[in-house]
C-alpha cells in the first residue's frame, strides 16, 4: 500500500489517517525538526464513483424528462444508459475493463446503477415498490427493481 511504501522509505514516520477526508497526513522527522506533508488519495474509479460524479441532479432530470410512466424498472435506465450517457458509460467500461467480457461488465454497470438508485432514491424522488422481470442490456430476461416516482 501507499502507506507501507512510505514507511519503508521514511522509518521515522508518524501517519494519521482521517477517514472522513480522503487524505493522509504524513509527519516526517528529519534531522532538523518535523515536516508535515498531506497526500491526497484519489477514490478508486468505478461505475458507482462515476455515477456520483454525474450526480443526482442529472439522474433526476433524466428520470423525470425521459420516463413518462409513473412506475418504471431499473432496466428502463440501464438499457438506455450507454446511448444517453455515452461518456459516462465508456468510462465505466474502462474502469471495469479487467472484470470480464462486455456482457459481464454490462451486468456490473447495471448492478451499480441499481445500487446507486437505491442509495439515492430520496434525492431522486423515487421509491422502490418491488421486483419485476424484464429484458436487460444484454438481451436477457432478469429480475430488476420496480420504482415509482413521487
Question: What positions do the PLM features span?
Answer:
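Flexible coil/turn residues that form the inter-helical turn or adjacent wing/linker of helix-turn-helix
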Residues: 70
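Phospho-regulated, low-complexity intrinsically disordered regions of nuclear gene-regulatory
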Residues: 38-65, 75, 83, 87, ...
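The alpha-helix within a helix-turn-helix
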Residues: 78
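Cationic, low-complexity basic patches in intrinsically disordered or flexible, solvent-exposed regions
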Residues: 8-9
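Long, compositionally biased intrinsically disordered regions
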Residues: 23, 30-37
Amino acid at each position: 500500500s501507499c502507506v507501507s511504501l512510505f514507511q519503508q522509505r521514511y522509518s521515522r514516520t508518524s501517519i494519521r489517517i482521517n477517514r472522513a477526508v480522503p487524505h493522509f497526513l504524513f509527519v516526517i522527522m528529519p534531522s532538523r525538526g518535523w515536516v508535515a506533508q498531506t497526500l491526497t488519495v484519489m477514490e478508486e474509479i468505478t461505475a458507482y464513483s462515476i455515477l456520483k460524479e454525474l450526480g443526482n441532479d442529472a439522474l433526476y432530470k433524466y428520470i423525470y424528462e425521459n420516463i413518462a410512466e409513473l412506475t418504471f424498472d431499473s432496466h428502463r435506465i440501464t438499457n438506455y444508459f450507454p446511448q444517453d450517457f455515452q461518456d459516462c458509460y465508456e468510462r465505466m467500461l474502462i474502469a471495469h475493463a479487467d472484470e470480464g467480457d462486455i456482457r459481464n461488465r454490462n451486468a456490473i454497470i447495471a448492478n451499480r446503477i441499481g445500487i446507486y438508485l437505491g442509495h439515492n432514491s430520496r434525492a431522486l424522488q423515487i421509491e422502490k415498490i418491488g421486483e419485476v422481470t424484464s429484458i436487460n442490456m444484454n438481451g436477457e430476461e432478469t429480475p430488476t427493481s420496480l420504482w415509482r416516482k413521487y
